[in-house]
Regions:
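Short, small-residue-biased leader/transition segments that mark boundaries at the very start
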Residues: 2-7
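A conserved beta-strand-to-alpha-helix junction within the catalytic ATP-binding
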Residues: 8-24
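Conserved catalytic submotifs in the C-terminal HATPase_c
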Residues: 28, 33-44
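Short beta-strand/loop element within the Bergerat-fold HATPase_c
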Residues: 74-84
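Acidic ATP/Mg2+-coordinating residue in the GHKL
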Residues: 92
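Short conserved segment of the HATPase_c
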Residues: 97-111
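Conserved glycine-rich
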Residues: 138-139
């Protein structure tokens, strides 16, 4: 059953700080520190289905939690303004993803060797859902990672722009 997307313009600052607050509470219970920074001006709006983008953030973060191997876990969320898009960066200091695995992490059911052999293996669909939701929004998602250091997940959403009246 496909849920109808409820897309509307949302204030970037309000929306993402709410998301970060929710995530922060969950991370706190796990002893992981959240660092949140919004570099976007006050009244910028983004076109998004609020529930779906929450799910994107949740899936990325739960992945980061799953592969967190440091005694002091830190997850950073940065919101940046890049032209017609808002870019969200979610960085962790977990175990990282091997270069050979990076291109495939958004494929359905793909799991790295590490996760296949770990007790924490997930279903392998979390990040493919992320990719689908973002593509439905006309956005995209990608990642950079260094083994032993951590991973940065990036995604972009289109800004809402008032069309000036002629």
């Amino acid at each position: 059953r496909q849920r109808q997307m409820c897309i509307r313009d949302r204030n970037v600052e309000d929306y993402f700080s709410d998301c970060a607050e929710e995530v922060g509470l969950e991370l706190e219970t796990r002893g992981i520190e959240l660092v949140y920074a919004n570099y976007v001006e006050d009244n910028v709006q983004v076109i998004a289905d609020g529930e779906q983008i929450r799910r994107v953030i949740h899936n990325i973060i739960s992945n980061a939690i799953k592969y967190m191997d440091k005694p002091k876990g830190i997850i950073q969320i940065r919101i940046k303004d890049v032209g017609d898009f808002i870019q969200v960066e979610i960085e962790d200091n977990g175990k990282g993803i091997a270069a050979k695995d990076l291109p495939s992490i958004f494929d359905r059911f793909y799991r790295t060797d590490v996760s296949r052999n770990s007790s924490k293996g997930g279903s392998g669909i979390g990040l493919s859902i992320v990719k689908k939701i973002l593509e439905d929004h006309g956005g995209k998602v990608w990642a950079t990672s260094r083994l032993g250091i951590g991973t940065i997940m990036y995604f972009v959403l289109r800004k809402y722009q008032e069309v000036p009246m002629k």
